[in-house]
Regions:
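Cytochrome P450 heme-thiolate "Cys pocket" and heme-binding signature region
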Residues: 310-376, 384-389
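Cytochrome P450 core scaffold surrounding the K-helix E-X-X-R motif
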Residues: 303-311
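Cytochrome P450 catalytic-core helices
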Residues: 214-221, 225-250, 330-350
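Conserved cytochrome P450 K-helix E-x-x-R motif and the immediately C-terminal K′/meander segment
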Residues: 250-287
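Cytochrome P450 catalytic core segment centered on helix I
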Residues: 148, 157-207, 211
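Active-site substrate-recognition loop segments, prototypically the cytochrome P450 B′-helix/B-C loop
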Residues: 1-132, 141-159, 163-165, 172
Length: 389
C-alpha cells in the first residue's frame, strides 16, 4: 500500500484484494507493519460503530512499533479526539464540535472568494498553471489558517509539519515542528482572542491543557490541508476528464456538487484511514483480527463495494469518505463548502481550462492513506486579472 504501483492504480489492487480475501485483507502499512484493511462496506460500518470492541487508542500497539517507523506520525497516540476512546474521546469531541460549529459558513464563503481571486490572478495571464502548488494547496492553507486564527508565519510551519506527516517523515521531527508552531499559535490567541477555532478551544469548558490544545489543532490541520487539497484537485480532475462535466448541452451538465458527490464515492481523498485497534482477538466475517493490531477502513474500497455500489451518486450521501460512527468527521459541511466554492471560482474565471497532459501521465504520490496527485498541470487561454472587490 506504500508503493508507487499501488498509488498509480489502487482500484485494481482493491479488486484483487476482494477477489482473493473478501471483506478483510492482511496488508502492510509500511515494511514490517501488519494491519487488516477493511474493504467491505457493511463490515466497515459495523466496526466503525463498535468503539467498545474497536477503540481508536493505539497506545498498546505503539509499544511494538520502532520509533523511526515512517507511519508513526500518522497513527501514534495523541491526546485528541481522533486517537482516544471512551470518556477521553467524548471530552475532546465535544470541544472540537463546539469550536467547528462556531464557524460562520456565510462568512467562510466570502473568505474562500477572497483567497481564490488573488491566487487565480497570479497565473491567469500565463495560460498555464499547476493546480496543486498554485491553487489547491495555497487556498486550503490560507482558509485553514483563517479558520484557526493562525497568521501566515506560524501557518507555514504547520503546513510543513502536515506534509511531513503524510509523507511518513520521522515522528520526532514532525512533532517538534508541530509542537513549536501550534504552541506559538495558542500563546498568540490567549493574548489576542478572535472569532476562530483556536480561541473557541481555549474558552471551552473542557479546560484543555496546552498539550491537548496543540493536539486538537493537529487534528484540524491533519483533516484539513492534505484531504481538502486533494478533494479539490481530484474533483477538478474528474470534471476536466469526464465528458459528462463538459457542459456542452446547456442545463444538462452535472454541477460541481454532483462531481464532489461522485468523487467522494469513487475516489475519496483520504482513501484509507479510520484506524482502530481490537481490544482482544476478534472474529469478523470468518477472520480473526489480532488484538491491538491496526484495523484500517478503506473508504475508497468500501464505497466501491459491489454489495452497495449501483453507480447512482445523485444526492447519495451513504459513502464513507467522511467516516462513520463516533469518529466521523465533524467538519464535513465546512470542507464541502470550501471545495465547492474554490472549484466554482476557478472554473468561472477560466472556463476553457484543460489538462496539459493526458490523465494517465499524471503522477500519484505514494502513501497508504491518501489519494494525492503530485502535480496537476493545466492550460487555458490567457486571461486578464479578475477584479477584487
Amino acid at each position: 500500500m506504500y508503493s508507487e504501483e499501488f498509488a498509480t492504480d489502487p482500484h485494481h489492487a482493491y479488486r484483487e484484494m476482494r477477489r482473493q480475501y473478501g471483506s478483510l485483507v492482511p496488508v502492510e502499512l509500511s515494511p514490517g507493519v501488519p494491519a487488516t484493511l477493511v474493504i467491505g462496506y457493511h463490515t466497515a460500518v459495523r466496526i466503525s460503530n463498535d468503539p467498545d470492541h474497536f477503540p481508536a487508542d493505539p497506545r498498546t500497539w505503539q509499544q511494538s512499533v520502532p520509533a523511526d517507523c515512517p507511519i508513526l506520525p500518522m497513527l501514534e497516540w495523541r491526546p485528541n479526539a481522533l486517537r482516544s476512546a471512551g470518556l477521553e474521546h467524548a471530552r475532546y469531541r465535544q470541544a472540537n464540535a463546539a469550536a467547528i460549529d462556531g464557524i460562520d459558513l456565510h462568512a467562510l464563503h466570502s473568505a474562500v472568494e477572497e483567497v481564490a481571486v488573488p491566487l487565480i490572478n497570479t497565473f491567469c495571464e500565463d495560460g498555464a498553471a499547476d493546480l496543486i502548488s498554485q491553487y489547491a494547496f495555497p487556498l486550503t492553507f490560507a482558509v485553514l489558517n483563517s479558520i484557526a486564527g493562525c497568521p501566515p508565519d506560524i501557518g507555514q510551519q504547520v503546513a510543513y509539519g502536515m506534509a511531513a506527516m503524510f509523507e511518513g517523515v520521522d515522528a520526532d521531527k514532525v512533532n517538534a515542528i508541530f509542537g513549536g508552531a501550534l504552541f506559538d499559535l495558542i500563546t498568540l490567541k490567549r493574548a489576542e482572542p478572535g472569532d476562530d477555532i483556536t480561541t473557541r478551544l481555549l474558552a471551552h469548558p473542557a479546560n484543555l491543557a496546552d498539550a491537548e490544545l496543540i493536539n486538537q489543532l493537529v487534528t484540524l490541520y491533519g483533516a484539513g490541508i492534505e484531504p481538502l487539497q486533494n478533494l479539490m484537485a481530484n474533483t477538478l480532475l474528474l470534471m476536466l476528464t469526464d465528458p459528462r462535466f463538459a457542459g456542452n448541452v446547456p442545463g444538462a451538465a452535472p454541477s460541481t456538487k454532483d462531481a464532489l458527490n461522485e468523487l467522494l464515492f469513487t475516489d475519496p481523498p483520504l482513501a484509507n484511514f479510520s484506524v482502530t485497534y481490537p481490544r482482544q482477538p476478534t472474529l469478523i466475517d470468518g477472520v480473526w483480527l489480532p488484538a491491538h493490531q491496526p484495523v484500517v477502513i478503506s473508504m475508497s474500497a468500501c464505497n466501491n463495494d459491489p454489495a452497495i455500489h449501483d453507480g447512482d451518486y445523485t444526492d447519495n450521501h451513504s459513502h464513507l469518505a467522511w467516516g462513520t460512527g463516533p469518529h466521523a468527521c465533524p467538519a464535513k459541511s465546512v470542507a464541502y463548502l470550501v471545495a465547492n466554492n474554490a472549484i466554482d471560482q476557478l472554473l468561472d474565471a477560466l472556463p476553457e481550462i484543460r489538462l496539459a497532459c493526458s490523465a494517465d501521465q499524471l503522477v500519484w504520490r505514494p502513501g497508504a492513506f491518501h489519494r494525492a496527485l503530485a502535480t496537476m498541470p493545466v492550460v487555458f487561454p490567457k486571461s486578464p486579472p479578475l477584479t477584487v472587490f
